């Protein structure tokens, strides 16, 4: 088991992000010490943390990540989500360019 700080370094998600993800029900600690309140994560949770970090880096919001994460085994569904995110990003870019003119 890894303390939250150790898991944070390995997953490249901040401690604050890990706490937020726990509150959102996206990545709960494997266990929490009842006496100290310390959060412990399993190495088996690293792939999920990496998926979450990748989705965040692509601009997905936390609520959308909650919808996309369970679809990770379905390649077609993930491709659709990525296509939609790409279209969103394109629209955001075009709106920003219009504001600059």
Protein language model annotation of sequence segments:
Residues 1-63:
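Basic helix-turn-helix/winged-helix DNA-binding cores
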Residues 53, 70-101:
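Short, charged amphipathic alpha-helical surface segments
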């Amino acid at each position: 088991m890894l303390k939250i700080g150790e898991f944070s370094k390995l997953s490249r998600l901040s401690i604050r992000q890990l706490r937020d993800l726990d509150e959102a029900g996206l990545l709960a600690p494997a266990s929490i010490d009842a006496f100290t309140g310390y959060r412990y994560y399993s190495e088996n949770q690293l792939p999920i943390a990496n998926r979450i970090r990748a989705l965040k880096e692509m601009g997905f919001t936390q609520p959308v990540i909650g919808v996309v994460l369970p679809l990770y085994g379905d390649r077609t569904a993930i491709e659709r989500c990525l296509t939609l995110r790409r279209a969103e990003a394109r629209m955001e870019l075009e709106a920003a360019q219009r504001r600059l003119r």
